[in-house]
Amino acid sequence: NKINPSIKHGNYDPDTTVDPFASINAYKARSLNGIWATAPYLHNGSVPTLYDLLLPKKREGDPEDGEYRPDQFEVGSREFDPVKVGLKSGGYKGFTFRITNAKGEEIKGNSNAGHEYTSGKTAQPNGKILPPLNKEERLDLLEYLKTL
């Protein structure tokens, strides 16, 4: 049987099983247009800025002096952070979004892990891990994303 071209984009191989449309019943990411104005990021709002999204989550064994996604930040501000590209996430009295509870245990549904392609943590579908972006490359990428 000839496999017709798929309308799904990205890393996708057409499904030839009994239920060929099951693989496209999935989350569809939004366009990057206006991404600078849609903080906080990830499905649960656990990353306050695009700059933080380009960083990895701190894991056990990671060096203390590295740059990581914040484990907590203030929410409720409408003040734009033009450097990190998101909403101001500190320096005012707001609600504190926490990844972990007082015991240091991760709060279910509040994880800020995943989608760490630019930090050299998440592998591509072929298993290849891309090299991490340095700070200058992250800032250059943010400048581009501001134009969308």
What is the role of each PLM region?
Residues 1-148:
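Periplasmic c-type cytochrome electron-transfer domains
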